[in-house]
């Protein structure tokens, strides 16, 4: 399947397929290979300035870090995402959502629910930059 995808797809499609493979690896507990793939995918999107995908894959990586209790790495990751969004001039609402997330990480109060809510929000905010972030009460 991967060979066919590489043959028929463009570079972004191939990287998105790798991202999917990373999610599957994470689900199967192959955390080392998942982390390496998430980082590779993230670097690809950073190089091309595809900010929302950088944030999404970073949140996947953040979930992995949280699951492993790697809070220092999660803190650095959130700082990097926020800096990228500020540098790219991403909408105020998305930046405000990321600041809230960063504060939760810094206070070590972040949850899987908050990461999930932020991922859903960023996906929706991509086409509606004025959409406010409202985390669920279970986050």
Residue ranges and their predicted role:
Residues 12-54:
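Alpha-helical adaptor scaffolds
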